């Protein structure tokens, strides 16, 4: 009887831990967003340009990183939380 109780408690504990890890991973995915903008390269002020572009579509990000992909486009990686 002791072994069965221990097994059930252990199973419930592991289930709770795994569900919490999945929630944290899902929340992290919502915090980061990447998008390609075809309005030219990053230039000298790429971070602010990315923030303005994301603000027009979603909301204002906390931090952005601008990467030149081509002469005519840039990739913006932004963090929202």
UniProtKB/Swiss-Prot annotation:
First and last residue of the signal peptide: 1-26
Key words of the record: Disulfide bond, Secreted, Self-incompatibility, Signal
Annotated tissue distribution: Expressed in microspores and in young and mature anthers.
One GO term describing the cellular component: extracellular region
Main localisation: secreted
Biological process per Gene Ontology, one example term: signal transduction
Intrachain disulfide bonds: 31-81, 42-66, 50-76, 64-78
Record flagged with keyword Disulfide bond: yes
Record localization: Secreted
Transmembrane segments: none
Function: Involved in self-incompatibility.
Note: The two genes are located within a perfect direct repeat and probably exhibit identical expression patterns.
Family: Belongs to the DEFL family.
Protein's UniProt name: Defensin-like protein b
Species of origin: Arabidopsis lyrata
């Amino acid at each position: 009887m002791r072994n069965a109780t221990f097994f059930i408690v252990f199973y419930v504990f592991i289930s709770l831990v795994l569900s919490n890890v999945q929630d944290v991973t899902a929340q992290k995915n919502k915090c980061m967003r990447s998008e390609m903008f075809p309005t030219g390269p990053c230039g000298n002020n790429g971070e602010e340009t990315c923030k303005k572009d994301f603000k027009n579509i979603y909301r204002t990000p906390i931090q952005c990183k601008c990467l030149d992909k081509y002469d005519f486009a840039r990739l913006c990686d932004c963090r929202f939380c």
